[in-house]
Amino acid sequence: MIRIHPISGNKKQYLDLLQLADEQESMIDRYLERGEMFILSDNDTVKASCVITCEDKGIYEIKSIAVYPEYQRQGYGRQLIAFVLEHYKDRCHTMLVGTGDSPLTIPFYESCGFAYSHRGPDFFID
């Protein structure tokens, strides 16, 4: 049974999962405490995580979404995004996501309803 639930304390216990999306712990630290974290588990086994931050009034950003490699391409990431969009729909008019240029990630987000907006220089450095 799939369950998605928020994590309020000890978010760093999922550092191995978070580092699948962002290898630099210092970057994770920048958003982890101010963000809301969700874990997706299936049959009591953690499969995926995401962290959402409020960037401005009504503007939120998916800072991190990660699925353990052995569980990828099984719909867990898509379910987590669908949950997040539903969870924030009443307080969010814009949901952002920043990602690399991987040939898999942009089409994935587009298939989840996101529209490509622009390419930012040094996005992962600033």
Stretches with model-predicted labels:
Residues 71, 75-83:
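Conserved acetyl-CoA pyrophosphate-binding loop and the N-cap/start of the following alpha-helix
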Residues 28-32:
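Short loop/turn motifs at secondary-structure junctions and domain boundaries
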Residues 96-98, 110, 115-126:
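Conserved catalytic-core motifs of GNAT/GCN5-like acyltransferases
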Residues 67, 81, 102-105, 122-126:
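Short glycine/proline-centered loop/turn elements that form peptide/ligand docking sites
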Residues 39, 45-54, 58-66:
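Conserved beta-strand in the GNAT
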Residues 1-10:
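Conserved N-terminal entry element of GNAT/NAT acetyltransferase domains
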Residues 88-101:
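Conserved GNAT acetyl-CoA-binding A-motif
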Residues 65-72, 100:
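A short, internal acetyl-CoA/4′-phosphopantetheine-binding micro-motif in the GNAT/acyltransferase core
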